[in-house]
Structures are given as structure tokens and as C-alpha cells.
């Protein structure tokens, strides 16, 4: 198919419509999935599988082209005078490929998971639509088109978060949307400023354009990193993740955790390691100072994120909530690697190798965790780990795959997490040796501490679910049959085992054939790229490092178990939501109330001031009447006064009716949107494909996003 779509080849730059086709197929296909579901649910499910599988094929085509040295591009129609394009280098194609493949596995896992769900057509519709937005993020050549796909993904995924429509799901969905709006507006503001100061929004090295912008360069970096940081789960912008994961269906949680948060990381990568770097021609210049400062900050954001989230994961009893905090912690590892790459600047290839490898690894073992736990959840409908246990005999293939995922995230040698965590450890050590700053020495120690905490909370999760005595209520739910997995679930589990084992046993092949070629469009010193290529993780020093982390983890587990600290509940005031977001919402509420009160009082002054104006006018007319006008003049004035009084009364009555009607319409609109929550009705179409149940929050989002896009793109960009 790729050969058919080739339009022109110029050296290693290939103009090709394949990126656009790859995105349009799931976006348009989602409509087909929804329409078919009105007639035949099974056909709708089958089409969803076919679309996701075909997307894997298309992304594989782009990956092979990029692996052979080609960069695919396709120019999109300009938006408000801003050129947009799709551009696929090896980095984007790798992200798109593992995204599409894991999405395909999640769609397969969704077949048995959603088999008896009345809203499964809506679920598969938005699942495929979100796939289009997510893949589109990785195939863009500029930040504006990336933003549009980013927002499409955000809005479509909302339906996955609130799918169960429980009280907790709706609350989690509201927080997800509100933070998504804030992140989107922050990102858009940064893009607007970037275009204003550089004249372009292309994803390419622009440090030479940004160096003389003063504080604008700092502001652009803050706005764009914060915008992507919301989706990446960066502390303190992470609070939607622990709320969304427990309430979403397990396959959707796998995608939220394993894939969608990678879109945020991808955006930060493109900012820190590309946008804020000089081009290759200026690589030896002194333009790296700003990049180094950004990298230093990102290192510590990553360290804080990984450590705090790991501590929170240790204290969770809800398995899905534990995995949510685990995802935040692992994103901290990735952010630390991005920061190390930025801090090292031209010599940052090791950081690039570490965070890239860990992004791929985390996508597989974390998606595996959620999908595998979903197999158990469909039988038991239980997420409290205290009520689970002894399940390894009932779910043998799930148990084996879960063990492989656990070994991967712990960093046990021979599994995928070991290689990427070792490269990340090398990167933070190199960052310390770059300038020998004491805080980076401390960062390396906290890295090791967090690795130990990771071992601790994963051991808690694994042991609580699969070992111990089988609970009586569990045995009643499962019955006496030996195994509870169906064929599709076993196939998905075995695929996770094979991929994680391959990524762990062949790190040299991954680095030499995938990771190192991915550095080509980035500005890195060839010496350090070759150093990354020759780095071996199978040496006594690195093995000793992971042994220390494993020993710390075992020690933490024994300590927490004996002291009965695994169920310890932290006080509310240490919560970011309690101590930061709730006060911020209250302050904003007070501010908006005062502004509204001022507007209302001003309107009242105008409203009540009109009679005073009329009275003063009457006095003036009376004076003229006595001194100047004759009898006919007085009659004329009296007629005018009566006409004015009549018009005034009519105006007052009209205003009152307008206020009454506006209030009535607003109340009706609010109550209608408020009642949009799903209620079972006799009409099967309403049950199957009721999009309106996304409640008042989506209405707000659509209005805000539409208004912002319309005003900013049509006026600011012109």
C-alpha cells in the first residue's frame, strides 16, 4: 500500500499520504463501528478488531520505511495561515507502531471483557476514535496539528473514563476533562507564543530562533511542558490518573496508562530534546545553556514524580489504583531521562537511549498489568487486594504473564525493564559527572531508593493477588473448574510474555537497530551515540546496582508487612488535590463570584438610574414650560412626556420579559444537560449509542475548546 501512495521521493525525504491514511482510517472507522452497532453488535465488534489490526499494518509500513532511512511527510491544508503537515521519522514511527499494536491487543482483550455490557458499541466506537487521535499525535510535523490530534484524543477518551457512569466515574471524568482543558489551553498558548516569536510551529531545532526572545522562551517552555505534563501524569498535574484508572474498563485503563500518557511524554521529548536545541550546524555553539537549565529542572520533576508516586503506590489496597500510581512513578523515570538528555545537551545520547527504551518497555508491561488484571476482574468484580489471593491455580496463564510483567517493571535481569533502567541510571550518573553538582548526586540516590520501592509495591500486588489462601467467596464465584481463562485471553497473555522476554533478552539488538537510529534527527555528538551503541548492561557493576535495588525492595516489603503499614492512610492535607486544587477552585469561585457581583451591581445601577434621568429631564422640561412655551407648547411637551413615559414603561416590560425568558431558557438548558446521564429506555438504539450521557462537562468542553480555537486561530495567527 505504501508503494501506491508514494508521490515523490527526494533523497531520504518521501512525500507520502500514508500518515494521513493511517490516522483517517480509525477516525472514519469509528463512525462505521457506531453505525453498524445499531444493527448488529457482533459485526461492530468485528469491524473494531479489523480496523485496529489494519492500523498496525499501516504503522508497520511506516516503521519499515523510517528504518530504511526515509522520512515520510505529507502537507495538510493550512489553518488560519499556518502551514500544517504530517512528518514521520523513526521516533514517531516507533511510537505509532507500539501504540497501534498494544491498542490491537486491548481491542482483543475487550471482546470478552465487554461481552455482556449494554454500552459496548459506544465503548468500541470511542476506543477506535481515540486510537486515531493517539496515533495522529506521533505522526505530526508541527505543534499545531499535534495539538489538534492531542485534543481529539483527550475528548474521545473521556467516554472511556466515564463508561460505567457510576458516581466515581463521573467525578473522575470531570476532573479528567477539567485538567485536560487546562492542559490544552496551556499548550495552545505556548504554541501561539512560539509562532509569534519564531514565525513557525514546526517540530525542529529552533534554539537559534529562541535565544534572543528573553523571557518569552522561558514562558513558552513552561506553558508547553505543563500542557503535555497533564497527560504525562507529571506531579503535581497527575491527580486525574489515580481517579480515572480504577473506574475505567481494564482494557481502557491499559491504554490510558500504557499509551495515552506517552503522548504527554512524547510532547515533552520534542520540546526538550528538539525544539530547545540548536541545529546540527550550530551544535558546537554556545546555545546549549538554556537547554541545560530546562533539563536540570525536568530531572527534578522526574525524581519527585517517581518517588512520591512510588510511596503512594505502596499504600494502596485498590489494585488498579496501585497500578495508576505505578504509572505515574514510571513516568517519573522517563521524565528524569528526558531531563538528563537535555541537561547533557550535545552529549545526551545516553539519556535519550534510556528514556526511549523505557517508554517502549513501560508501554508493554503496564498495559499487560491492566489487561491481565481485567481477566481476573471480569470473574470476581473485585479490586481490593485484601479480598483476593490464591488465584494462581485458577488463572495459570494470567499468573505466568503477570509474573513476567512484574519481573520487567522490577528490573530483574533478563526482562525488559532491566536494560532501560540501567541506561537511565547511566544517564543520571553522567549528568552528575557533567558538573558534579551535589543535587544530582542526591538525585541518583533517590533513583535507587525509588527502584527499591518499585520492587516493594509490585511484590505486594503480585503476592496479594496470586498467593495465600483462596477466599471462600472467591471459590464460590469461580466454581470448581481448574482454569478460568478463555482462548483470546490466553493468546493476549502469551503475546505479552513473548514481547517482554524479547525486549529483555535482546537489549543489544534493540539499542543498535532501533534506539541508535532514532537519534538521527536529534542533535547529538557522534562520540556519545557510539558510546551508547557499545554500552553493555551485562557487567558486574550494573548487575550489582540492580541487586542493591532488589535488596532494598525486599527490605521495604518485610518492613511494611511487619509494621502493618501497607494499609496506612495518609491524612488529607498531604493530598495535592486537598491542599492545592481544592483551595484553587475555591479561590477561583470567589473571584468569579465577585466579578459577577460587580457586573450585576453595575447593571442594577443602570437599570435603577433611568428614572432619575427621566426625573431630571422632566424638571428641565417644566422650567422651559413656565418660561418659554405657550399653551400649545405645554401641550406638545405634555405629549412628549407621556410618549417618553410610555416608551420607558415598554422598555422596562421588555427587559423584564427578556430576563424571565433568559432565566427560563438557562434553567431548561442546565436541567436538560444535567439529566443527560444514561437511563435505560425501551429504545435499543438509545441504550446502545446514547452519546448524550457524557453530561454537562463535555458540553462545557466543546464550548470552551471551540471558542478558544475560533478566536485564537482566526485572529491571533492572522
Description of each model-found segment:
Residues 2-6, 72-80, 202, 206-208, ...:
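Membrane-interfacial helical/loop segments at transmembrane boundaries in membrane proteins
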Residues 256, 475-478, 484-506, 510-706:
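Membrane-interface and transmembrane segments of multi-pass membrane proteins
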Residues 11-21, 85-98, 136-148, 290-297, ...:
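Membrane-entry segments of alpha-helical transmembrane domains in multi-pass membrane proteins
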Residues 105-115, 121, 131-146, 156-484, ...:
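Hydrophobic transmembrane alpha-helices and their helix-loop junctions in integral membrane proteins
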Residues 710-718:
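Juxtamembrane boundary at the C-terminal end of a transmembrane helix
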Residues 2-20, 31-125, 200-208, 281-284, ...:
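Transmembrane helix-loop-helix hairpins at membrane boundaries of multipass inner-membrane proteins
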Residues 9-13, 209-211, 285-291, 353, ...:
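Membrane-interface segments at the starts/ends of alpha-helical transmembrane spans
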Residues 19-26, 44-58, 92-99, 123-130, ...:
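Hydrophobic alpha-helical transmembrane segments of polytopic
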Amino acid at each position: 500500500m505504501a508503494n501506491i501512495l508514494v508521490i515523490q521521493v527526494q533523497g531520504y525525504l518521501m512525500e507520502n499520504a500514508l500518515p494521513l491514511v493511517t490516522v483517517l482510517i480509525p477516525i472514519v472507522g469509528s463512525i462505521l463501528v457506531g453505525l453498524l452497532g445499531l444493527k448488529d453488535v457482533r459485526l461492530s465488534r468485528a469491524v473494531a478488531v479489523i480496523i485496529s489490526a489494519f492500523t498496525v499494518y499501516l504503522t508497520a509500513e511506516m516503521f519499515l520505511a523510517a528504518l530504511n532511512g526515509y522520512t515520510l511527510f505529507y502537507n495538510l491544508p493550512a489553518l488560519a495561515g499556518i502551514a500544517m503537515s504530517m512528518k514521520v521519522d523513526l521516533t514517531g514511527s516507533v511510537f505509532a507502531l507500539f501504540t497501534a499494536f498494544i491498542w490491537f491487543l486491548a481491542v482483543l482483550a475487550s471482546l470478552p471483557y465487554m461481552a455482556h455490557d449494554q454500552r459496548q458499541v459506544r465503548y468500541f466506537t470511542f476506543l477506535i476514535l481515540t486510537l486515531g487521535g493517539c496515533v495522529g499525535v506521533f505522526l505530526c510535523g508541527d505543534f499545531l496539528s499535534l495539538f489538534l490530534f492531542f485534543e481529539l484524543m483527550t475528548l474521545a477518551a473521556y467516554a472511556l473514563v466515564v463508561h460505567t457512569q457510576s458516581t466515581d466515574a463521573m467525578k473522575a471524568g470531570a476532573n479528567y476533562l477539567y485538567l485536560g482543558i487546562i492542559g490544552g489551553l496551556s499548550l495552545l498558548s505556548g504554541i501561539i507564543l512560539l509562532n509569534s516569536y519564531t514565525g513557525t510551529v514546526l517540530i525542529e531545532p529552533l534554539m537559534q530562533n529562541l535565544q534572543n526572545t528573553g523571557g518569552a522562551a522561558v514562558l513558552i517552555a513552561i506553558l508547553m511542558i505543563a500542557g503535555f505534563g497533564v497527560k504525562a501524569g507529571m506531579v503535581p498535574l497527575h491527580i486525574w490518573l489515580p481517579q480515572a484508572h480504577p473506574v475505567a474498563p481494564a482494557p481502557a485503563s491499559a491504554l490510558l496508562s500504557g499509551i495515552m500518557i506517552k503522548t504527554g511524554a512524547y510532547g515533552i521529548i520534542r520540546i526538550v530534546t528538539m525544539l530547545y536545541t540548536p541545529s546540527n550546524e550550530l551544535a558546537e555553539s554556545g546555545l546549549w545553556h538554556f537547554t541545560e537549565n530546562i533539563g536540570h529542572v525536568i530531572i527534578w520533576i522526574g525524581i519527585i514524580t517517581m518517588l512520591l508516586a512510588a510511596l503512594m503506590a505502596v499504600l494502596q489496597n485498590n489494585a488498579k489504583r496501585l497500578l495508576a500510581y505505578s504509572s505515574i512513578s514510571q513516568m517519573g523515570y522517563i521524565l528524569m531521562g528526558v531531563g538528563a538528555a537535555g541537561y547533557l545537551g550535545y552529549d545526551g545520547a545516553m539519556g535519550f537511549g534510556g528514556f526511549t527504551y523505557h517508554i517502549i518497555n513501560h508501554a508493554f508491561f503496564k498495559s499487560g498489568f491492566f489487561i491481565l488484571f481485567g481477566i481476573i476482574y471480569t470473574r470476581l468484580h473485585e479490586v481490593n487486594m485484601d479480598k483476593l489471593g490464591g488465584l494462581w491455580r485458577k488463572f495459570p496463564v494470567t499468573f505466568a504473564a503477570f509474573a513476567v510483567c512484574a519481573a520487567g517493571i522490577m528490573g530483574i535481569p533478563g526482562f525488559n525493564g532491566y536494560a532501560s533502567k540501567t541506561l537511565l541510571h547511566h544517564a543520571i550518573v553522567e549528568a552528575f559527572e557533567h558538573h558534579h553538582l551535589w543535587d544530582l548526586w542526591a538525585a541518583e540516590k533517590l533513583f535507587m531508593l525509588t527502584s527499591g520501592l518499585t520492587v516493594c509495591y509490585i511484590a505486594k500486588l503480585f503476592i496479594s493477588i496470586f498467593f495465600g489462601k483462596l477466599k471462600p467467596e472467591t471459590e464460590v464465584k469461580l466454581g470448581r473448574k481448574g482454569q478460568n481463562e478463555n482462548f483470546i485471553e490466553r493468546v493476549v497473555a502469551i503475546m505479552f510474555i513473548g514481547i517482554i522476554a524479547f525486549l529483555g533478552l535482546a537489549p543489544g539488538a534493540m539499542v543498535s537497530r532501533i534506539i541508535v537510529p532514532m537519534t538521527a534527527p536529534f542533535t547529538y555528538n557522534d562520540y556519545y551515540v557510539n558510546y551508547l551503541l557499545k554500552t553493555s548492561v551485562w557487567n558486574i557493576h550494573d548487575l550489582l546496582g540492580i541487586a542493591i535495588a532488589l535488596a532494598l525492595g525486599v527490605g521495604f516489603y518485610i518492613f511494611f508487612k511487619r509494621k502493618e503499614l501497607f494499609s496506612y492512610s495518609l491524612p488529607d492535607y498531604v493530598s495535592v488535590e486537598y491542599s492545592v486544587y481544592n483551595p484553587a477552585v475555591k479561590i477561583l469561585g470567589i473571584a468569579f463570584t465577585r466579578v459577577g457581583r460587580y457586573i450585576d451591581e453595575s447593571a442594577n445601577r443602570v437599570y435603577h438610574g433611568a428614572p432619575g434621568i427621566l426625573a431630571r429631564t422632566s424638571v428641565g422640561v417644566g422650567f422651559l414650560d413656565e418660561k418659554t412655551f405657550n399653551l400649545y407648547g405645554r401641550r406638545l411637551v405634555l405629549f412628549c412626556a407621556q410618549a417618553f413615559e410610555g416608551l420607558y414603561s415598554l422598555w422596562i416590560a421588555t427587559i423584564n420579559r427578556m430576563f424571565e425568558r433568559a432565566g427560563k431558557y438557562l434553567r431548561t438548558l442546565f436541567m436538560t444537560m444535567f439529566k443527560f446521564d444514561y437511563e435505560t429506555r425501551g429504545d435499543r438504539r438509545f441504550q446502545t449509542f446514547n452519546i448524550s450521557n457524557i453530561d454537562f462537562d463535555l458540553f462545557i468542553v466543546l464550548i470552551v475548546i471551540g471558542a478558544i480555537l475560533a478566536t485564537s486561530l482566526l485572529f491571533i495567527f492572522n
